[in-house]
């Protein structure tokens, strides 16, 4: 069989790639459910690793074929409702962009699962984790290949479910259960609003494939108000999936789950929501209000997430808020019709953030501590982890020549022509991110060893090897971006722009290096400064605001509804029952037991009824 035939077959059967992940979940179920308890407990882990590797290799072959021969659509007819003028197909878009995103997902999933093999070495529920990881991978792979909005919505719902299950992995801890519930409910808000938009579009467009939706959007006859409401409903789902303001709290809650799952959430799960948003943009651009909302949300998330991250002491939360900030930049690029820039930013961010998450996961594994004020001196004891953190941080903060430098340069150049103010947000975010990562590095890896780090040692090879692989990937990110580059060239910006981007990163690095830490940023005695510190540390009191507004409103409405149901509905029914019982009791006491009395009562009643009837007739 020739190579060209193999490549062609790999593309024809590309629809199998999402199924690989679900197959990994299925083969893990006998161990995850306890049907097999004692025999080879690591077998499901090895099976899932093999399946993820097969998915990655299959995607690589398909990508080579598509780059040579062009994209095509794989379509399986599913449901045709001619009376309702609605046709639903299982449709996959096998394009270079989608396959590149698929390779990112399957590759990072494989590396994260290999990392989990060492991180969860002593975990009794290892099979359950790998079953959920397979489910996770299958849903994400389906989202990026999907060419149908209905199909994408269904797969996004699967992502929400898998997030709930993975965050609640250690369900014996009450805090974990609460975090899983809060993360699920927060994402459900966006999912329900997206469902409203999907249902509305199914009635308007007559088909749910994106090409059908684009054709309908060009002929859109809806009123401006209806178009705006539809657009706001459609963006709600991606806002929740990408952890954007005001639905960003779930990513912070999700940090209660195992760190290998956090690697995927911080890197590729949020990417899936952004990809769905990009596919919806030809529809959303018909509403200027929707675009303005996207820009506002992206700006608030980028600046707010960056500011909040520098006030956190939980090492995992310093990265989760940084993820919110970078996805805010992606939202700005998408709203300003720069999808290629958004894709490159997602690509560079995902690889660097995955490596950062692995490095801090290694720190947590050896110290059993997430509070950076209790860590220190790990640089000399964990050289591989330290190197991974440094390279990942440099790749994320736009330092030449690593990946995000080229993304920020392109962002400054392309967005600066349209809206210079939004281009400045890229620089501010880069500066604050560099400040945050430098602060964490000084706190964790430099200084004297703390009690929890004095006996720390480098992690095992199963955790170190994935970090080394990703370290190389971060270093090669510019080369990979050039290969899949949908723009004229990743270096197609002026030297002044490049110097500006590099300077913004160096400014943040310098501030982070000179600011006094003293093992913690102590609360200032100056009241205004203390207020700012608390404002950032508590995420602008977003959760308290929700509690005082939405939660209290819903609780009040629930109380009123409960009172109405208890006092009015149940009260009326109970009153009728009590009245019947009391009437029967009174009637029982009035009975004499004589037949003459019964006959007389019946006769009187009949006479009364006849008299009333004759009166009514007359």
From Swiss-Prot:
It comes from the Eukaryota. Pfam families: Proton_antipo_M (PF00361), Proton_antipo_N (PF00662). It is a multi-pass membrane protein. Keywords: Membrane, NAD, NADP, Organellar chromatophore, Plastid, Plastoquinone, Quinone, Thylakoid, Translocase, Transmembrane, Transmembrane helix, Transport. The keyword RNA-binding does not apply. One of its GO terms (molecular function) is NADH dehydrogenase (ubiquinone) activity. Gene3D superfamilies: 1.20.5.2700. GO terms for cellular component: organellar chromatophore thylakoid membrane; plastid. GO terms for biological process: ATP synthesis coupled electron transport; electron transport coupled proton transport. Its EC number is 7.1.1.-. It is found in: Plastid, Organellar chromatophore thylakoid membrane. NDH shuttles electrons from NAD(P)H:plastoquinone, via FMN and iron-sulfur (Fe-S) centers, to quinones in the photosynthetic chain and possibly in a chloroplast respiratory chain. The immediate electron acceptor for the enzyme in this species is believed to be plastoquinone. Couples the redox reaction to proton translocation, and thus conserves the redox energy in a proton gradient. NDH is composed of at least 16 different subunits, 5 of which are encoded in the nucleus. This is NAD(P)H-quinone oxidoreductase subunit 5, organellar chromatophore 2. It comes from Paulinella chromatophora.
């Amino acid at each position: 069989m020739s190579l060209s035939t193999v490549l062609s077959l790999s593309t024809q059967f590309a629809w199998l790639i999402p199924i690989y992940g679900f197959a990994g979940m299925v083969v893990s179920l006998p161990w995850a459910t306890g049907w097999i308890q004692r025999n080879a407990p690591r077998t499901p882990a090895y099976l899932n690793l093999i399946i993820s590797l097969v998915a990655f290799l299959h995607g690589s072959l398909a990508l080579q074929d598509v780059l040579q021969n062009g994209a095509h659509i794989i379509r399986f007819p599913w449901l045709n409702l001619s009376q309702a003028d609605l046709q639903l197909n299982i449709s996959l878009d096998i394009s270079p962009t989608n396959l590149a995103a698929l390779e990112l997902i399957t590759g990072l999933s494989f590396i994260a699962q290999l990392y989990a093999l060492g991180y969860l070495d002593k975990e009794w529920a290892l099979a359950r984790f790998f079953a959920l990881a397979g489910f996770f991978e299958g849903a994400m792979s389906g989202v990026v290949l999907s060419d149908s909005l209905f199909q994408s919505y269904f797969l996004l719902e699967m992502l929400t479910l898998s997030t709930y299950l993975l965050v609640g992995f250690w369900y014996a801890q009450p805090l974990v259960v609460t975090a899983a519930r809060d993360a699920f409910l927060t994402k459900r808000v966006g999912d329900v609003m997206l469902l409203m938009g999907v249902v509305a579009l199914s009635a308007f467009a007559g088909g749910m494939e994106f090409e059908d939706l684009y054709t309908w959007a060009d002929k859109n006859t809806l009123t401006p108000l209806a178009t705006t409401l539809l657009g706001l409903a459609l963006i709600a789902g991606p806002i929740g999936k990408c952890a954007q303001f005001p639905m960003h709290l779930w990513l912070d809650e999700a940090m209660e789950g195992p760190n290998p799952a956090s690697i995927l959430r911080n890197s590729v799960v949020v990417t899936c929501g952004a990809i769905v948003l990009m596919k919806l943009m030809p529809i959303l651009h018909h509403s200027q209000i929707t675009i303005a909302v996207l820009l506002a949300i992206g700006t608030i998330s980028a600046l707010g997430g960056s500011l909040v991250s520098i006030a956190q002491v939980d090492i995992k939360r310093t990265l989760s808020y940084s993820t919110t900030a970078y996805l805010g930049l992606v939202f700005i690029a998408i709203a300003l019709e720069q999808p290629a820039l958004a894709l490159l930013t997602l690509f560079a961010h995902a690889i660097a953030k995955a490596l950062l998450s692995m490095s801090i996961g290694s720190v947590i594994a050896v110290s059993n501590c997430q509070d950076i004020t209790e860590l220190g001196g790990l640089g000399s004891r964990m050289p591989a982890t330290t190197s991974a953190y440094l390279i990942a941080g440099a790749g994320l903060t736009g330092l030449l020549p690593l990946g995000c430098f080229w993304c920020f340069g392109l962002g400054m150049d392309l967005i600066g022509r349209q809206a210079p103010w939004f281009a400045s947000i890229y620089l501010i975010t880069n500066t604050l991110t560099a400040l945050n990562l430098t602060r964490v590095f000084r706190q964790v890896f430099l200084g004297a060893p703390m009690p929890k780090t004095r006996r720390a040692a480098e992690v095992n090879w199963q955790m170190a090897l994935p970090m080394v692989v990703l370290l190389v990937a971060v270093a090669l990110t510019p080369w990979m971006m050039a290969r899949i580059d949908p723009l004229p060239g990743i270096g197609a910006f002026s030297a002044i722009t490049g110097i500006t981007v590099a300077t913004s990163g160096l400014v943040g690095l310098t501030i982070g290096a000179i600011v006094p830490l003293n093992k913690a940023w102590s609360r200032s005695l100056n009241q205004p400064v203390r207020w700012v510190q608390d404002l950032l540390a508590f995420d602008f009191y977003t959760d308290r605001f929700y509690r005082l507004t939405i939660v209290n409103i819903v609780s009040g409405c629930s109380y009123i509804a409960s009172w109405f149901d208890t006092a009015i509905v149940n009260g009326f029914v109970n009153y009728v029952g009590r009245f019947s019982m009391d009437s029967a009791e009174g009637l029982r006491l009035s009975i004499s037991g004589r037949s003459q009395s019964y006959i007389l009562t019946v006769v009187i009643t009949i006479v009364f009824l006849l008299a009333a009837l004759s009166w009514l007739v007359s």
